[in-house]
């Protein structure tokens, strides 16, 4: 067992809750102890939903373990059926509830409800949240759409001449990263192509809507982590092809439009010609040259991580120095993507490994989840969130999709704004030695007082002063500091000044390498010559 203060994915029953919460008129009866009701907060507090998830917990306590917990589950199921009157019900157990082995599926079926009751058997200690969402959606589609399936060997009828093509949008759930706005953007894009959306599922769909899935001509898979298993089943049973391209980024959206147009038998060129996106021009304009070769580290779910790496490399000119995911089921896809950029994929669900990798690679921008935001803040690196799990600020009130052409505009703004603008960098370099604007100087309107103890220069350089040195008033009268390396080597003032000429984003690495070189070679005082000797040594 591994104890941790953070997890990228919850247990699989949280994935089932995401599907149930996204749908309408579906209820989830969960055999779980009192402590597992915490999951409600994910939806009401973080996603800011205005109603509780459609989940009934049995909430058994320790005192109930000596009684009939099966009867407790059956009573909860009866009450949920009578109170909420759902069109369908899913039943299962949480990770703790599964240890009792009460068989919620069998118990619920024995109650003889007049609605479909779908047992969701999730291996709580082998799988995690995204797998639980995928399995739940697959079981729902199979149980509810299955009775409408054509007989084996039946050919799919041709669409009538002049009839608009129809598709299903598969994969969006509650608690997903920008799923609400992605649905709107992709529906609008498909409408421009003359394609109607038949059903969006799970989000917004009812069990009755799932019976109509087979009426579509093809399926659009927006989030493979949730929808790929169900889409494969629909292709096999209903002979519906499904899309493989995820429309995140300008290039991917153009490929998606062509792929969808091919499935629907329509011309994509008018839509592509009229596409409104500013990312290509902004990223090629003169004032965006500072983006070129910015080192970026990317970590998230496989769908968003792979798409983000492509945008970073091909559309913004960044250099991808790290790529990883917590989705082990999609590890092969991420490894293949990482190979294109000449990096080794990081497949892990341990945030400490991710933090160590970020510290090792010294990126200039981190793209990740809520945890990578914390990691980047600790390391002083700009960050943008690209993937779930996310916190409340990534469920904005405004329209902010990630998919489609408008999603590309949102991505450009989100990623570029945390970076230091080229003009700012130029001005900092120009005035870094100015008496008024140098590190540690007080704002001019505050007069000549002591520099604040938390000034950036004081944080960056450890100052070694003689114990007998007097305390002088006025920032201008402070003696020149002599930095001390952690290894014991002392930085000479001229070497410290030379170090400041190195660009800020690699200055920390240069300092560490020089101190390491001095320590290994027994150098007591780091001079300018030592600095360049270290540079030559590590450049070999």
Curated annotation (Swiss-Prot):
The record's section on Gene3D superfamilies has: 1.20.89.20, Nitrogenase molybdenum iron protein domain, Proto-chlorophyllide reductase 57 kD subunit B
Pfam family of the protein (one): Oxidored_nitro
Needed cofactors, names only, are:
[4Fe-4S] cluster
Question: Coiled-coil ranges per the record?
Answer: none
Detail which positions bind [4Fe-4S] cluster: 36
Q: Name one GO biological process term.
A: light-independent bacteriochlorophyll biosynthetic process
Could you say which EC number(s) this protein's record lists?
A: 1.3.7.7
The secretion signal range is none
Catalytic activity annotation: chlorophyllide a + oxidized 2[4Fe-4S]-[ferredoxin] + 2 ADP + 2 phosphate = protochlorophyllide a + reduced 2[4Fe-4S]-[ferredoxin] + 2 ATP + 2 H2O
Q: Which SUPFAM superfamilies match?
A: Helical backbone' metal receptor
Q: Which residues bind substrate?
A: 422-423
Where is the catalytic site? 287 (proton donor)
Report the sequence similarity comment from the record: Belongs to the ChlB/BchB/BchZ family.
- Quaternary structure, from the entry: Protochlorophyllide reductase is composed of three subunits; BchL, BchN and BchB. Forms a heterotetramer of two BchB and two BchN subunits.
Task: Kindly provide the name given to this protein in its UniProt entry.
Answer: Light-independent protochlorophyllide reductase subunit B
Q: Gene for this protein?
A: bchB
């Amino acid at each position: 067992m591994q104890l941790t203060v953070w997890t990228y994915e919850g247990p699989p029953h949280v994935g089932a809750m995401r599907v149930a919460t996204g749908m309408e008129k579906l209820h989830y009866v969960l055999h779980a102890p009192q402590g597992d009701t915490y999951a409600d907060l994910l939806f009401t507090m973080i996603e800011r939903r205005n109603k509780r998830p459609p989940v009934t917990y049995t909430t058994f306590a320790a005192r109930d373990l000596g009684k009939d917990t099966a009867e407790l589950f059956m009573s909860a199921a009866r009450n949920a059926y009578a109170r909420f009157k759902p069109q369908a019900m899913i039943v299962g157990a949480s990770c703790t509830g599964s240890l009792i082995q009460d068989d919620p599926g069998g118990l619920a079926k024995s109650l003889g409800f007049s609605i479909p009751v779908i047992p969701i058997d999730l291996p709580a200690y082998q799988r995690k949240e995204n797998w639980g969402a995928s399995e739940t959606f697959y079981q729902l589609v199979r149980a509810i759409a299955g009775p409408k399936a054509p007989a084996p060997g039946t050919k799919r009828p041709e669409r009538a001449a002049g009839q608009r093509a129809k598709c299903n949008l598969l994969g969006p759930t509650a608690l997903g990263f920008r799923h609400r706005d992605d649905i709107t953007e992709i529906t609008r894009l498909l409408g421009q192509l003359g394609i109607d959306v038949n059903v969006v599922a799970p989000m917004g769909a009812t069990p009755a809507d799932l019976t109509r899935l087979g009426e579509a001509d093809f399926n659009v898979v927006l989030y493979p982590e949730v929808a790929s298993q169900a889409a494969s089943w629909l292709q096999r049973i209903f002979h519906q092809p499904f899309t493989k391209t995820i429309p995140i980024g300008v290039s991917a959206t153009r490929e998606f439009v062509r792929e969808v147009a091919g499935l629907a038998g329509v011309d994509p060129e008018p839509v592509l010609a009229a596409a409104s996106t500013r990312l290509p021009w902004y990223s090629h304009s003169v004032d965006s040259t500072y983006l070129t070769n910015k080192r970026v580290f990317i970590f998230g779910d496989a769908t968003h991580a792979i798409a983000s790496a492509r945008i970073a490399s091909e559309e913004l000119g960044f250099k991808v120095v790290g790529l990883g995911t917590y989705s082990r089921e999609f590890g092969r896809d991420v490894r293949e993507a990482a190979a294109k950029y000449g990096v080794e994929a990081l497949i892990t669900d341990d945030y400490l490994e991710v933090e160590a990798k970020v510290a090792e690679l010294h990126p200039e921008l981190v793209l990740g989840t809520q945890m990578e935001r914390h990691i980047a803040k600790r390391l002083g690196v700009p960050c943008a969130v690209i993937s779930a799990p996310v916190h409340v600020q990534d469920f904005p009130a405004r329209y902010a999709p990630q998919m489609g052409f408008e999603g590309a505009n949102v991505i450009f703004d989100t990623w570029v704004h945390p970076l230091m603008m080229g003009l700012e960098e130029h001005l900092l370099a120009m005035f870094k030695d100015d008496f008024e604007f140098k590190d540690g100087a007080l704002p001019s309107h505050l007069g000549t007082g002591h520099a604040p103890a938390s000034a950036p220069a004081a944080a960056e350089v450890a100052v070694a002063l003689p114990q007998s040195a007097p305390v002088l008033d006025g920032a201008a009268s402070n003696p020149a500091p002599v930095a001390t390396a952690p290894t014991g080597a002392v930085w000479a003032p001229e070497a410290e000044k030379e170090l400041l000429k190195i660009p800020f984003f690699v200055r920390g690495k240069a300092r560490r390498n020089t101190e390491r070189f001095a320590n290994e070679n027994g150098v007591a005082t780091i001079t300018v010559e030592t600095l360049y000797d270290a540079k030559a040594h590590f450049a070999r």
